[in-house]
């Protein structure tokens, strides 16, 4: 279990529930783990991607679980509290939201990390914070602090969704913090003004929120400031 915080990265052995550090013959990992970190993920190939100290690290393990190589991409500066990382293509080459743009992170023959823009249409306004993206059918949904974007990979086109004060079926706010998909393929969008559920039949949203800022709102939430969401079977867990 890998956990990141301002104090660094902690690794817990779930069989003993004690701290552990994978064997690393080159001794590179220890220094990385001591740096303040904001995001960690595992890709489809079993590699760990760790963002810390404005750097993105790819940690590769051998069959014994020992560290084989550590590759680093420098100057990965955040535009917000976190960084969006996802193995969208399930090839181990992750998509990353960096400096208002979505890039694919690859590596060369020497193991050095390189980046390539996914598409020209996925370059956003300067300073845009990309909080998350996920794959749903053949489209990638992208949450930002400036609305929701729907990218069709086949057609290489983007559609943007924004809050409209005159439309109660629009997004409840443009600052989006997280995305998730339920078992029945519903897209859930977390914002700092409640939760939005996308309706593909009408191409709009239903809002769940506390208070009376929108007609039909309820007191289902203890706060409208949603930081993260997790869907599990028929349940939606909200962190506020």
Each model region followed by its residue ranges:
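Carboxylate-rich, polar loop motifs that coordinate divalent cations or form catalytic acidic clusters
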Residues: 1-240
